């Protein structure tokens, strides 16, 4: 973990060639080549999980104002953040068009055309697109932006409430798989009524604890009930010939998944990337002298082919610069495994390996076991990154029994668990008094007799309170 996280995060995005924030619109950044590769492998992981029981689609970017305005609660939640297109060339449009802030109001009019019968259900589509929100707070690349460039949204329709509830649990399991693969620990809460997705019956949310103690919302899942089905007339004919409204869910992930993987695993030397999303999982660094140069380079190429045959992503850094600069660069960029090979190593049939999480030299034989030994090192690194992150996460959730303790613990960089009655007025009062956010319900209290931290009423839940991004 890094100490001055805000400064570190800003610097590492630039130094590691992830994004460039100098684009002349606030809150919009350029994905640079190395960052774009990280993004590509992250979206590949998301697609691998969602392609199992969803189909990928792609909807237009523009949403007619009339469609956006149909669902009152929904548009109220986004109306201050919408970008509007008012002209086509020099001609003023008859109807304003919104750059999608999210896609419910563009997707669901089409669902009303596509769903006719119970045999059309369940309908499960997802897309990975860019969305736009006029963010007025302090923007931060990948965390708080005006253009979300990697927005995965899944939208499902079902014949019954029970099926929609089951789908919410399936979304939760999908997200757990994605976050677990990346070694990102999380809290899962049911968002309070005042903070749920506009138009939803309820919202479940995943939050990661960043190195500065703030929480970052990294995934949300919404049970929409029949709210949007009523608005957009999404009905089906059941087996008995009766027309009924569908039940719906939606679920979203964004660039924040990448931000959390970068932030949670990084250290003072730079990135420590989970192997799943590292552009290169192995970097081979030839140590070259005039004598034996060709033999070393030939062996590096041979090793590269062997690793690639095993499904690994490999590069050879044969730039004409000092080895020390190469070591520095790949530590900064977080490549999981670095292999050094020089004439003496080749003579001794050895190579020097180094795991990015430990930075200790490991001597390996250049034999038939090399590939399996390196794969073992990658697996050990992956496991260690996850365990270290989990330990930090667990250590930074503390219980408080009074409001003063809540403030103190959060200022010390923790997320705080409290007993809560569940009343909306009480929850909003907690936020007002502390200046921090009630993330939501962490778990239900099974034993009676415990009192709410504020109202002194019987507590029903354990809630989490945090400083948030």
From Swiss-Prot:
> Molecular function (GO) terms listed?
ATP binding; proline-tRNA ligase activity
UniProt KW keywords: Aminoacyl-tRNA synthetase, ATP-binding, Cytoplasm, Ligase, Nucleotide-binding, Protein biosynthesis
Where it sits in the cell: the answer is: Cytoplasm
Q: Does the keyword Ligase apply?
A: yes
This entry carries the following GO cellular component terms, namely:
aminoacyl-tRNA synthetase multienzyme complex; cytoplasm
Any one of the GO BP annotations: prolyl-tRNA aminoacylation
Pfam families the UniProt entry points to: HGTP_anticodon (PF03129), ProRS-C_1 (PF09180), tRNA-synt_2b (PF00587)
Per the UniProt entry, the Enzyme Commission number(s) are 6.1.1.15
Residue ranges of the TM segments: none
Instruction: Please give the InterPro entries that the UniProt record associates with this protein.
Output: aa-tRNA-synt_IIb (IPR002314), aa-tRNA-synth_II (IPR006195), aa-tRNA-synth_II/BPL/LPL (IPR045864), Anticodon-bd (IPR004154), Anticodon-bd_dom_sf (IPR036621), Pro-tRNA-ligase_IIa (IPR002316), Pro-tRNA-ligase_IIa_arc-type (IPR004499), Pro-tRNA_ligase_II_C (IPR016061)
SMART domains according to UniProt: ProRS-C_1
The domain of life for this entry's organism is: Archaea
Q: What reaction gets catalysed by this protein?
A: tRNA(Pro) + L-proline + ATP = L-prolyl-tRNA(Pro) + AMP + diphosphate
Q: What family does the entry list?
A: Belongs to the class-II aminoacyl-tRNA synthetase family. ProS type 3 subfamily.
What's the entry's take on its domains?
A: Consists of three domains: the N-terminal catalytic domain, the anticodon-binding domain and the C-terminal extension.
Q: How does it assemble?
A: Homodimer.
Role description: Catalyzes the attachment of proline to tRNA(Pro) in a two-step reaction: proline is first activated by ATP to form Pro-AMP and then transferred to the acceptor end of tRNA(Pro).
The name on file for this protein is Proline--tRNA ligase
């Amino acid at each position: 973990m890094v100490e001055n996280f805000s400064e570190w995060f800003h610097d590492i995005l630039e130094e590691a060639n992830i994004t460039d924030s100098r684009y002349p619109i606030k809150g919009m950044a350029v994905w640079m080549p190395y960052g774009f590769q990280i993004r590509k492998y992250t979206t590949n992981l998301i697609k691998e999980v969602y392609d199992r029981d969803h189909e990928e689609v792609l909807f237009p970017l523009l949403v007619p104002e009339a469609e956006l305005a149909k669902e009152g609660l929904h548009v109220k939640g986004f109306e201050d953040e919408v970008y509007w297109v008012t002209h086509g060339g020099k001609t003023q449009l008859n109807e304003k068009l919104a750059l999608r802030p999210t896609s419910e109001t563009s997707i669901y009019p089409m669902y009303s055309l596509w769903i006719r019968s119970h045999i059309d259900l369940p309908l499960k589509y997802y897309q990975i697109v860019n969305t736009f929100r006029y963010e007025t707070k302090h923007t931060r690349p990948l965390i708080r932006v005006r253009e979300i460039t990697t927005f995965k949204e899944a939208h499902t329709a079902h014949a019954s409430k029970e099926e929609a509830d089951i789908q919410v649990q399936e979304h939760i399991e999908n997200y757990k798989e994605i976050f677990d693969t990346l070694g990102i620990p999380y809290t899962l809460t049911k968002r309070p009524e005042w903070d749920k997705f506009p138009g939803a019956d309820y919202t479940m949310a995943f939050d990661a604890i960043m190195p500065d103690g703030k929480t970052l919302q990294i995934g949300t899942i919404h049970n929409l009930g029949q709210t949007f089905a009523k608005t957009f007339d999404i009905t089906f004919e059941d087996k008995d010939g009766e027309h009924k409204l569908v039940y719906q869910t939606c679920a979203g992930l964004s660039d924040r998944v990448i931000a959390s993987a970068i932030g949670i695993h990084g250290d003072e030397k730079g990135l420590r990337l989970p192997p799943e999303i590292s552009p290169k999982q192995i970097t081979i660094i030839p140590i070259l002298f005039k004598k034996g140069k060709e033999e070393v380079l030939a062996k590096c190429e041979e090793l590269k082919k062997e690793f690639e045959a095993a499904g690994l992503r490999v590069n050879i850094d044969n730039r004409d610069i000092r080895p020390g600069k190469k070591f520095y660069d790949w530590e900064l960029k977080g490549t999981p495994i670095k292999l050094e090979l020089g004439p003496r190593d080749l003579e001794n049939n050895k190579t020097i390996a180094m795991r990015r999480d430990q930075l200790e030299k490991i001597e390996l034989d250049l034999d038939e076991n090399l590939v399996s030994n390196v794969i073992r090192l990658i697996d050990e690194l992956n496991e260690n990154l996850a365990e270290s992150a989990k330990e930090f996460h667990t250590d930074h959730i503390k219980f408080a029994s009074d409001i003063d303790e809540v403030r103190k613990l959060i200022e010390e960089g923790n997320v705080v668990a409290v007993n809560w009655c569940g009343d909306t007025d009480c929850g909003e009062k907690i936020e007002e008094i502390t200046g921090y956010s009630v993330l939501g319900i962490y778990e239900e209290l099974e034993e009676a007799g415990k009192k709410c931290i504020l109202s002194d009423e019987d507590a029903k839940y354990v809630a989490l309170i945090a400083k948030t991004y």
